[in-house]
Amino acid sequence: MGRKWANIVAKKTAKDGATSKVYAKFGVEIYAAAKQGEPDPESNSSLKFVIERAKQAQVPKHVIDKAIDKAKGGGDETFVQGRYEGFGPNGSMVIAETLTSNVNRTIANVRTTFHKNGGNIGAAGAVSYMFDNTGVIVFEGTDPDHIFEILLDAEVDVRDVTEEEGNIVVYTEPTDLHKGIAALKEAGITEFSTTELEMIPQSEVELSPEDLEIFEGLIDALEDDDDVQKVYHNVANL
């Protein structure tokens, strides 16, 4: 899965460059998690996980605290998760995951974004069957066999463990992501650069320069939408 991890890194790096967007989207995700349970990460595991991911993305503490304080203060916004699937040029596939306080607005915006950027939105399940929902854990290390043994002993359902450029990359069943993180922490590994659920394509396509330009415009437009939290695709050369 090495190449797949390389693509995830490339997408994260490109997205993380737009820091204000990243901060704002994590702020919404933290607020929503805090509103759904206690606004205390020690008693709300979902909130704790989002905060850990925000820290990995270098979201400042004041942004995290502001979102939690808003939830504590009785903010009345309710956010709903969504997923929209569609197609770009020449066999390219896209999944956009959303978190919104206005579903009608989000549906209209995502549909318009696809149509204006050479794509077509599909029905639920139109492309997601070609992606594997996967837990991804990344940390510094060079001994994947040792890490695999740790996870095996902890009865974590692991799909693969690889070493990529001085990093260990663990792929788990989505239901075992948190179990995998806990097992690694128990083994003394406490610093992670990524702990995410990712939709990883089962196969990839390469686009011509002309099609790639169109497709890149579609991805950029989706990622610029404030309601879109994550965008996944199957294009190898983006």
From Swiss-Prot:
SUPFAM superfamilies per UniProt: YebC-like (SSF75625)
Main location as per UniProt: cytoplasm
One Pfam family named in its UniProt record: Transcrip_reg
InterPro entries assigned to the protein according to its UniProt record, in alphabetical order: Integrase-like_N, TACO1_YebC-like_2nd/3rd_dom, TACO1_YebC_N, Transcrip_reg_TACO1-like, Transcrip_reg_TACO1-like_dom3, Transcrip_reg_TACO1_YeeN, YebC-like
Keywords, in A-Z order: Cytoplasm, DNA-binding, Transcription, Transcription regulation
UniProt KW DNA-binding keyword: yes
Compartment annotation: Cytoplasm
Record's GO cellular component terms: cytosol
Protein's UniProt keywords contain DNA-binding: yes
A GO biological-process term: regulation of DNA-templated transcription
One MF term in the entry's GO annotations: DNA binding
Coiled-coil stretches: none
HAMAP family recorded: Transcrip_reg_TACO1, Transcrip_reg_TACO1_YeeN
Family in the record: Belongs to the TACO1 family. YeeN subfamily.
Name the UniProt record assigns to this protein: Probable transcriptional regulatory protein YcdB
Organism: Lactococcus lactis subsp. lactis (strain IL1403)
